[in-house]
Amino acid sequence: QVFIAAGRDGTCMLFAREHKGHRGIAGTPLEVYVGCVIHDHDVTFYRYGSKHQECLQHILRYLQGSMDNEPELTWAKAMRDLHREMIAAVKALGEGECLDEDVVAGFERRDDEILDLADREYEEHPPTQYYRDGYNLAKRMRAFREAELLFLHEDVPYENSMAERVARKFKRKQHQVMTFRSMEGLEIACVAKTAIENMRTRGEDVFEGLAKVFARTAPAPA
C-alpha cells in the first residue's frame, strides 16, 4: 500500500505501508495534522484533522458508475449534475469571495431532494446482489453530507487533485514493474517519487536535483 499526503502548495510525500487504516497512517503527517483533510471515503480519515471534505472527483466517478449500472434510476444523474453545478459556482468566485447563503441553502435543499428521490427509487427498484454500489453511495452521501458539502461553506478544495495525480503516476509505474519484491523496494520508490514530484513542483531541474542527491557525502559514523 502507498499512502500519499499532499498539500495545497503542490508538495507531497509518499509512504510505503503494509497495512491500511490507523496502522498505515502512523508515522505520516496526517497523524498529527489539525487542519481540514481532503480525502476519499475511507472512514479512518475521519479520526484525524479538524474538518473533512470528501473528494468530489471520487463521488462523480461513483455516480457515473451508478448511471451505467442502474439506467432505470434517475437520482445519480441528477446528483452528478448538481455537483457539477456546485463546483462551477465555486470556481466562478473571485479571491476572498464566498457563495451567498441563499445559494448555498438552495444547493443543500436540492441535495436533500435528490437523496429522497434515491430512497424512493431504491424502494421501487431494490439493489441486486450483483450491484449495490449505487445504493450504498446514496446512503453514504446522506450520512456524510456535511463532509460532502463543506466546500460550499469554507475555502477548502473540493478534490485532492494533487494526490490523485501522483497516485495515477505511481499506479502506471506499478503496472510497468508488475510488483515490488519487498517493502524495501517500495519504500525506495516512494522516497524517489517524493523527491522528484517536489522538485517539479518547485520548478527545479529534476536531473540536476537528483545528481546533487547522489553526490552527497554520507555522514561519518559516530
Outline where the language-model segments fall.
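Catalytic center-proximal scaffold of phosphoryl-transfer enzymes
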Residues: Q1-A222
